[in-house]
Amino acid sequence: MGYEEHKQYQLDMRYLRMARIWAENSYCVRRQVGALIVKDKMIISDGYNGTPCGFENVCEDPDTGLTKPYVLHAEANAITKVAKSRSSSDGSTLYVTASPCMECSKLIIQAGIKRVVFCDDYHSKDGVELLRRAGIDIVQVAECE
């Protein structure tokens, strides 16, 4: 690995560690996911999975244990947050603790995000395949710290 590649790898690992820490803000019991959007080495947005603003912070249905249908994924929270700001996600990198699902992948494409770095696999690989088809650079880090 050359110097530039090593330097980028180190940055990727740092941002993924930060995304993991951010995931701790989630009230979801089944899975906590964190996301950061980075552009020009600056964090322009962040998100974690959880309920929309104004809703009770309970992600799972107490009777079934299943995730409530209105829970937002970390990627969607980060993308909608940057959309409300003066920043642009065009050309940015998304760091997320789990690979994006199909719905989040559509948002990633539309947001102009050009690179996605993640650790864990989501139960379906459809989202990652869609991102590849869209020409988005996908990096899975095998050993997340």
Predicted segment positions?
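Zinc-dependent deaminase catalytic domain
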Residues: M1-E145
